[in-house]
C-alpha cells in the first residue's frame, strides 16, 4: 500500500507526521505537488512534480493510485474520486472521507462555492489545532496497523 499526499496544500506538521510514519513502518509515501518540496532522504519517500495547472496533482494521484491506497487531501472532489477508485481518503485533520459522507461534503462545498461566486464571504478553514493534529496521527496509525 502507498500513502499519497496532495502536497501543495498539506500543512508542514502533517507532512512531518507522515514522513516519520513512512520511515518507521517502511511504507511508501509519495508527495505530489506543482512546486518543489523538501523531504527526508529515505527509500520510502519520493515526490512527483507536476505541471502547474488546475487539478494536475489530483489527476496524477487518481491516475496512479491503487485500491486501498491512502490519499491525504483536503480537496473534496479528489477525495470523492479516491473513494470511487476504492482508495481511502483522509483530510489533514484526520477526518476519513467515506462513501457515506462524501456526497454531503460535496454538496456543502458546492453551496460554499456558489456563495463565494455571489460575493459572500464564507471564510476558509481554521488553523490546524493540536487536537486535530493528534486526531490525524491516530487515524494514520489505525490505517497503518490495518494495512500491514
Swiss-Prot record:
Disulfide bonds: none annotated. It comes from the Bacteria. Pfam families: DUF188. PANTHER family: UPF0178 PROTEIN YAII. Belongs to the UPF0178 family. This is UPF0178 protein lpg0089. It comes from Legionella pneumophila subsp. pneumophila (strain Philadelphia 1 / ATCC 33152 / DSM 7513).
